[in-house]
From Swiss-Prot:
Binding site for Ca(2+) 2: D57, D59, N61, T63, E68
Domain EF-hand: 8-43, 44-79, 81-116, 117-149
Protein name: Calmodulin
Residues with the N6,N6,N6-trimethyllysine modification: K116
One GO MF term attached to the UniProt entry: calcium ion binding
Residues noted as binding Ca(2+) 4 in the record, renumbered to the chain: D130, D132, D134, Q136, E141
Residue positions where N-acetylalanine is found in the record: A2
Lineage: Eukaryota, Metazoa, Chordata, Craniata, Vertebrata
Residues engaged in binding Ca(2+) 1: D21, D23, D25, T27, E32
Length: 149
């Protein structure tokens, strides 16, 4: 879901994430979330903060990492997703511009996003999106993956 964001949006969210991640350890805790929300004039309870974290905490470790944060932001923007945004996202992944996303290109972009993926995990992501079985993802397959509910 986060891969439907443009490079510019991802950069903006990285900045926002850094504002929350006070100690710079790559995760947002309930304490850090509370600090930022209070600085924005909100007054969430500890339980509310925990609920907000749990909502996006995919791996269940009690904190939000950047990929989880991106997923949350992407969800909020999902309704405004246009064909142009999807095409732009495809271009971000299709580094050599040949119309296909290879495993190497996917790995490169994911690594730049701070995702440390094994070759198996990258191959698995390609397989899931690769409808025609050619080992890479073309634009149509990418659109299918991005618009799948």
């Amino acid at each position: 879901m986060a891969d439907q964001l443009t490079e510019e949006q991802i950069a903006e969210f990285k900045e926002a994430f850094s504002l929350f991640d006070k100690d710079g350890d790559g995760t947002i805790t309930t304490k850090e979330l509370g600090t930022v929300m209070r600085s924005l004039g909100q007054n969430p309870t500890e339980a509310e903060l925990q609920d907000m974290i749990n909502e996006v905490d995919a791996d269940g470790n009690g904190t939000i990492d950047f990929p989880e944060f991106l997923t949350m932001m992407a969800r909020k923007m999902k309704d405004t997703d246009s064909e142009e945004e999807i095409r732009e996202a495809f271009r971000v992944f299709d580094k050599d511009g040949n119309g296909y996303i290879s495993a190497a290109e996917l790995r490169y972009v994911m690594t730049n996003l701070g995702e440390k993926l094994t070759d198996e995990x990258v191959d698995e992501m390609i397989r899931e999106a690769d409808i025609d079985g050619d080992g890479q993802v073309n634009y149509e397959e990418f659109v299918q993956m991005m618009t799948a509910k």
